[in-house]
């Protein structure tokens, strides 16, 4: 079967999937959890082979250390978290059939705005084998079919998880064709041309990957090109709080797209706060790329100077995805906001301040999908937002923004329920009817639709 035929098959499977009850969709998720638990050792063994090959590539400079970290399924509780993510998605309310607007246009002529699936998704990702399970669970719950294209570095993990999904769906009412998995690099360019069948592309990977996809398809693309997050320490910030937040934002998981890459610090607290913050960071082996003002404060500190170096302009436009942080001194809140809006990636940015007025100004003025006050940027995550898991993070200014859960994979359709009315009966003049446009109580409809 050709690639186009596979995609067409997935589109046909979507037409079945979108009509299944939430009970049938949830049952498929249960089957995936069962298979993940049964085949855990198989999947981790395959992942270990990918890791072995990836480490060799990293040693030869052909693969970044951050990519290797993203690939590892055995670290910490990553596998169990992946399984729990499926259960969390299952526990969420059905995102389909929700009425968000209702009007009675006339007696017996009622209009409803109802949530529905997007259609056939194409998700292209690098490393991160858990994305297969994350996306599959969200797609099934939201009634979408999906074509998944993984990176070559996760080939064996991809194959093992593909077997899990295929086996699970074979025991459910969700068509196996609703989740298609492809690996050949050559197939990406072909997939990007299939706008007749594919409704939305969601890239998860490097800036270059996202830009390449946006430049080479007519299909709408949802995602973010970079995760260049910043923290700003305001003039009234508590030093201990700032140290704690900056440390977590940079070191909790440096390879994550919600880790901070730039620290902005108000000149009023440069001498009082930066030494403590820098000491905390360098104890965690973070290299600090400093502007002249911050460099002057830190260069003679024995505990930190070995990991301090002058910054260059490009550092403030770089997603390091590593234990590296660019530091810049700013004279005011307005200057901090201007820097972030100029150099940031519209992902997630944070202000550390005791002033609600300053925080509100920052959150209103920063052009990002997430703006935080006294909280780590690492919270920008679908699981932490209560979405179960996420399909990705969008910095687009369209229907979905920020961490995307089920809502990001639904759109809406208008349902008009009548009993034979014709448009020519309405208008101005003799014998014409006027529209009533009477609001219908949405709460009552929502309760009925959930039964």
From Swiss-Prot:
Superkingdom, taxonomy of origin: Eukaryota
Pathway info: Amino-acid biosynthesis; L-proline biosynthesis; L-glutamate 5-semialdehyde from L-glutamate: step 2/2
Keyword NADP tagged: yes
Disulphide linkage map: none
GO molecular function, one term: NADP binding
Chemical reaction(s) catalysed: L-glutamate 5-semialdehyde + phosphate + NADP(+) = L-glutamyl 5-phosphate + NADPH + H(+)
InterPro entries per the UniProt record, alphabetical: Ald_DH/histidinol_DH (IPR016161), Ald_DH_C (IPR016163), Ald_DH_N (IPR016162), Aldehyde_DH_dom (IPR015590), G-glutamylP_reductase_CS (IPR020593), Glu-5-SA_DH (IPR012134), GPR_dom (IPR000965)
PROSITE patterns tied to this protein: PROA (PS01223)
The keyword Amino-acid biosynthesis belongs to this UniProt entry's keyword annotation: yes
GO biological process: L-proline biosynthetic process
Its EC number(s): 1.2.1.41
One Gene Ontology term, aspect cellular component: cytosol
Similarity comment: family membership: Belongs to the gamma-glutamyl phosphate reductase family.
Function: Catalyzes the NADPH dependent reduction of L-gamma-glutamyl 5-phosphate into L-glutamate 5-semialdehyde and phosphate. The product spontaneously undergoes cyclization to form 1-pyrroline-5-carboxylate.
Name by which UniProt lists this protein: Probable gamma-glutamyl phosphate reductase
Source organism (scientific name): Schizosaccharomyces pombe (strain 972 / ATCC 24843)
Lineage, top ranks: Eukaryota, Fungi, Dikarya, Ascomycota, Taphrinomycotina
Gene that this polypeptide is encoded by: pro1
């Amino acid at each position: 079967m050709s690639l186009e035929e596979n995609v067409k098959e997935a589109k046909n499977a979507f037409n079945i999937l979108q009509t299944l009850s939430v009970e049938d969709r949830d049952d498929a998720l249960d089957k995936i959890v069962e298979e993940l638990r049964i085949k855990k050792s198989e999947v981790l063994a395959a992942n270990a082979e990918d890791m072995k090959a990836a480490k060799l590539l990293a040693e030869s400079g052909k693969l970044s250390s951050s990519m290797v970290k993203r690939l590892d399924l055995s670290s910490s509780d990553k596998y169990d978290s992946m399984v729990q993510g499926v259960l969390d998605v299952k526990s969420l309310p059905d995102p389909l059939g929700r009425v968000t607007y209702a009007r009675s246009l006339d007696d017996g002529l009622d209009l409803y705005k109802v949530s529905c699936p997007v259609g056939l998704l194409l998700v292209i990702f690098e490393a991160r084998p858990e994305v297969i399970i994350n996306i599959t669970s969200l797609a099934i719950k939201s009634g979408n079919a999906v074509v998944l294209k993984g990176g070559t570095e996760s080939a064996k993990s991809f194959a093992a998880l593909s077997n899990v999904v295929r086996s699970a769906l074979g025991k459910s009412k969700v068509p196996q064709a609703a989740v298609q998995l492809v690996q050949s690099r050559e197939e990406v360019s072909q997939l990007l041309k299939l706008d007749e069948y594919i409704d939305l592309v969601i890239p998860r990977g490097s800036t270059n990957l996202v830009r390449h996809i946006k430049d080479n398809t007519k299909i709408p693309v949802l995602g973010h090109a970079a995760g260049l997050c910043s923290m700003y320490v305001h003039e009234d910030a508590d030093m201990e709080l700032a140290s704690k937040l900056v440390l977590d934002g940079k070191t909790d998981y440096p390879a994550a797209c919600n880790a901070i890459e730039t620290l902005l610090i108000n000149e009023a607290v440069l001498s009082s706060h930066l030494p403590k913050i820098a000491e905390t960071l360098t104890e965690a082996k973070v290299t600090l790329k400093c502007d002249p003002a911050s460099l002057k404060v830190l260069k003679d500190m024995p505990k930190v100077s070995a990991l301090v170096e002058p910054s260059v302009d490009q550092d403030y436009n770089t997603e390091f995805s590593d234990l590296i942080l660019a530091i810049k001194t700013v004279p005011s809140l307005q200057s901090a906001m201007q820097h972030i809006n100029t150099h940031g990636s519209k992902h997630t940015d944070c202000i550390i301040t005791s002033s609600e007025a300053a925080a509100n100004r920052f959150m209103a003025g920063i052009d990002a999908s997430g703006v935080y006050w006294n909280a780590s940027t690492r919270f920008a995550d679908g699981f932490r937002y209560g979405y179960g898991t996420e399909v990705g993070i969008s910095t687009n200014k369209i229907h979905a923004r920020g961490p995307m859960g089920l809502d990001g994979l639904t759109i809406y359709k208008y349902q008009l329920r009548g009993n034979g009315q014709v448009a020519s009966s309405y208008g101005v003049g003799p014998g014409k009817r006027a529209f009533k446009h009477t609001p219908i109580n949405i709460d009552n409809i929502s309760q009925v639709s959930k039964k």
